[in-house]
Amino acid sequence: MLTPKTPRLPEPAIPEDVTGFELDRSVKNQLRTLSKENAVGVGQHLVMVAALLDSDIEAAQAHAETAVRRAGRVPAAREALGLVHYRKGEWAKALSEFRTARRLSGSSHMLPFMVDAERGLGRHERALDLAASPEAASLSQDERIELAIVVSGIRRDLGQYDAAVVGLQLPQLNAGSRHPWAARLFYAYAEALLAKGDEDGALTWFGHAARADLEGETDAEERLAELDGMVLTDLLEGDDDYEDDEDDEDDEDDEDDDDYEDDED
């Protein structure tokens, strides 16, 4: 007796102008293991994940889950679903998908996300061990910088503020840089300096981050304004204290004058 097929779940709609050919060549190469029709469909869903990740996470998840159902052994599909879980703070699910993608592809380029997921699960020491693993040596420059940013955050979590600062003092920490990672690197460095108690340094680097953040990835401008206000308040309070001290000195002088007059009498 034949077992009836499980009915296929409805798939989220694809806009007419999305073809799947928008994908990076490396992802297209992964899709070649599928039938032509399936490759086109999975590619379209992966394009939609990227398009919706920042604006509609639930819709992005629907497309990512569809891609995994149709192409569960394609690393890019597992990475897409992992990124959705990562954005939602579902660390264990994200880590599981990233590990599956790494096993399928043999690539460790998602290592910064895996380390951050371990951090999200509260497993800081495991995260640091993973960041120092041999796989990290295979990362590109951009990926190594992203990893350094994550590791600096872990050091801050652990109260290791000096290490958080030193870990970001890379050759790429150049205030004039406008690479895609520049704003995030400057922002993380400012956070590390602030955690260490260097408000002036933090103010400087939040400023660099705001100028480098052409895509609005960070809230550097808000942090800059907030910190600038705090510094100004501290200065004003310092002036008030100085004025209070002067008033106290004037009062003491008046009392001394009164005592002198009493002595003359």
Regions found by a protein language model. Give the residues of each.
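Solenoid-like repeat scaffolds
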Residues: L31-E37, E65-G72, R99-G106, S133-Q141, ...
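Alpha-helical segment of the N-proximal tetratricopeptide repeat
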Residues: T33-R69, A80
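TPR alpha-solenoid repeat register
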Residues: Q44, A77, M110-L111, A164, ...
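Structural register within alpha-helical repeat arrays
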Residues: M48, A80-L81, M114, V151, ...
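Residue-level signature for tetratricopeptide repeat
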Residues: A51-L52, G82-V84, V115-A117, I154, ...
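Structural motif corresponding to the intra-repeat A-B loop/turn of tetratricopeptide repeats
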Residues: L53-S55, K88, L121, L158, ...
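Long, acidic low-complexity intrinsically disordered regions
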Residues: D239-D265
